[in-house]
Amino acid sequence: KGGDESPAQQVVNEIEAMGGKAIANGDDISSWDGAERLIKTAVETFGDLHAVVNNAGILRDRMLANMSEEEWDAVIKVHLKGTFAPSRHAAAYWRDQSKAGKPVDGRIINTSSVSGIYGNVGQTNYGAAKAGIAAFTTIASLELARYGVTVNAVAPVALTRMTENLGPAPETEAEREQRSPKWIAPIVTWLASTESAGITGRVFEASGDVLAIAEGWHRGPTHKPVDDPTKLGPVVEEMMSKARLNAGMDGRDGTWPQPQKK
């Protein structure tokens, strides 16, 4: 829940000005009851539920050795529980509709991050939450397919109220344009549409630089099981020599900064 609901109401006003129908909800989506009210409000207002976009978030960036318990808990609660709670109540609604014999073509679109997929210094709390959302997306897609619901995620890079003070500010109008949320909206809109019915369990990177599919964890080099820890050194070294290097924040192999010991 944000402290200022006026941006949400502003969007409502814009939608209504174009002839659409909208309603703002100020409940805390990381609370069980608040998330339930959110879903009920949508169903009561529009008569049905077609898509849920989980996009609430906060930042409490800090190096691990300096991070407080409150900074950890706050980020995990808003991002991770704030994705689970609305999704859970939406899933129950669609399950009940399906069991009642009614047609269901539902969508859940979650918000992950390249920080959660690839890792970014100073964001153990945020990255852990966003990685959790990516895994949540994969598992929820398997569970909800039987009810006619797809679950995907978007890992965006854009300037918003949350990120505008994160990192160097764009120096030119072209750089600002490249980080505009307008590059994120199309993939979210498409995933919410009927055209995306065959796509589920995926994470899409989206920015002014690229639209890509993050392919997730895959098993790399293997070795037969070893039951003696004193013999593991050479085995691990051999596997590491064949393994792909971790991707960096740009998603490319080998661009992840290698840890340095002083």
Region roles according to the model:
Residues Y118, A134, I139-V149, T194-A197:
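Active-site-adjacent segment of SDR/Rossmann-fold oxidoreductases
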Residues M18-K21, K40-N54, R60, T150:
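A glycine-rich helix->loop->beta "capping" turn
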Residues M63-L64, E71-I76:
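Substrate-binding pocket helix/loop in short-chain dehydrogenase/reductase
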Residues S87, A129:
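Active-site helix of classical SDR
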Residues S113:
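Residue(s) in the substrate-gating loop at a strand-loop-helix junction
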Residues E5-S6, G26-R37, E69:
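The beta1-alpha1 cofactor-binding region of Rossmann-like NAD(H)/NADP(H)-dependent oxidoreductases
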Residues A153, E173-K262:
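C-terminal helical subdomain
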